[in-house]
């Protein structure tokens, strides 16, 4: 998909819904309550950053992400590999993300590290890194290259919504594994992982201490209970949030909308939960039409996935 350069963005007209739909199809989603002029300013910034990366790679042979991470030009992920992700993201969410630079990274990696994305909306920074093992392999350890890249590109596309409840849910739907798709939404933030591991590590330390001492100087059962509380909370929360999104999807289908995942991918948590409550199809369509009248984001969603503008 050919995107406009930073200098060409300003030529897009407010009534050019087809071009706006193409930008959306490239993963350049309109932010909540973002108007047309602000959207173009942001897209111009995004394109400028992408062009900046290309220019620096051509000029100096590397791009400096920060003081510790310098990305050489030879580690730039080629378009042919990034395009593998489109086979997953197009049928799921109707996006082919080709504007986010990606690099293979090899230094200081843990055994479980597969990749990550960097997003800074204020500075229009969008970039992702994946393990260098994927430069020559389509699969490494428990990861598939197309799954991992599509996962990171989903984060890049949806970051503008600044809505974290379903962020990991949508990213993990790119996985072919049912277990990963189900459990992926459990960990929303770094604190979820921290509070998950902390009591488990405390239990391990307590158990090792008792083994070394050779006698029970304190009961171990409270540590077992503590280690199970937060994992249970994560599972229950994940189950409840999945029920909301599945009900929302069912109600959208009942209203005659077929590209349900694409619509929900661009929706906020409050909108998703509202869809879950609207069992009356007429009320649901009325709600969407009201959003279309007030938001550019929903105008494009309606054109692409509800009015069959594609």
Predicted feature locations:
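Active-site scaffold of zinc-dependent metalloenzymes
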Residues: 81-82, 86-142
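Active-site recognition of the HExxH zinc-binding catalytic motif
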Residues: 143-160
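Hydrophobic core of alpha-helical transmembrane segments in multi-pass integral membrane proteins
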Residues: 197-207, 228-234
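Membrane-proximal soluble helical/coiled-coil segments
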Residues: 2-19, 133-136, 287-310
